[in-house]
């Protein structure tokens, strides 16, 4: 993914499950950061109440790469998926107590609005700065149901060419180059 993003100069997504798997991306994220490569890291995560209780391979994923990102988007957990489990362990306080079922749609809409904004900001930052971003997605199990279309409208970005050109006086450079007794050429990323 890093090589593809480098070649096409557009964001490329990498996706992983939660826990230790996410940490395996750190070398690529650091390289993308210092090489100006727009990498989008999408990670699944456990619900907040499952973190720091010894649940297998569960780590604090929010902002784990912040020193090498231009944007970190910790999304909010859906409240309509597996509501009974959320209510049973309402440590993350996603649903207010006492709970009124008619509030659920309004609460979910607020989550959707927040998540859509975070996704948009992350993708915009990756494109604008040509650097990596991280979108962390908490999910409640079970994850058996599927959907036919996304519930968040993804933004459409216009293609802006940000190719940088460097110009120098070619005659002056050629003259200087030809007079030099020793020459060194350094090649690297700009």
What is each of the regions a protein language model found here?
Residues 2, 25-27, 51-55, 84-88, ...:
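Short acidic, glycine/serine/threonine-rich loops at helix termini
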Residues 32, 43-122:
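Glycine-rich, acidic loop regions that bind phosphate or pyrophosphate groups
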Residues 15-17, 38-45, 76, 134-138, ...:
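Short beta-strand segments
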Residues 90-109, 113-121, 125-180:
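Conformationally flexible catalytic loops at phosphate/diphosphate-handling active centers
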Residues 1-51, 154, 159, 166, ...:
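Thiamine diphosphate
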Residues 8-12, 34-39, 68-70, 129-132, ...:
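Short coil/turn connectors at secondary-structure junctions
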């Amino acid at each position: 993914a890093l090589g593809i993003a480098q070649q096409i100069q557009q964001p490329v997504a990498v996706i992983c499950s939660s826990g230790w798997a996410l940490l395996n991306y750190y070398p690529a994220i650091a390289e993308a950061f210092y090489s100006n490569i727009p990498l989008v890291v999408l990670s699944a995560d456990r619900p907040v109440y499952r973190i720091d209780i010894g649940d297998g391979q569960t780590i604090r994923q929010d902002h784990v790469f912040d020193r090498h990102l231009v944007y970190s988007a910790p999304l909010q957990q859906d409240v309509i998926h597996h509501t009974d489990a959320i209510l049973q362990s309402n440590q993350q306080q996603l649903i207010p107590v006492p709970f009124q079922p008619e509030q659920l749609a309004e609460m979910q809409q607020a989550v959707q609005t927040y998540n859509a904004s975070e996704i948009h900001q992350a993708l915009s930052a990756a494109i604008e700065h040509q650097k990596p971003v991280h979108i962390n997605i908490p999910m409640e199990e079970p994850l058996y149901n599927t959907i036919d279309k996304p519930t968040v409208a993804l933004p459409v970005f216009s293609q802006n060419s940000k190719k940088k050109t460097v110009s120098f006086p070619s005659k002056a450079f050629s003259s200087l180059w030809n007079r030099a007794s020793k020459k060194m050429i350094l090649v690297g990323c700009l």
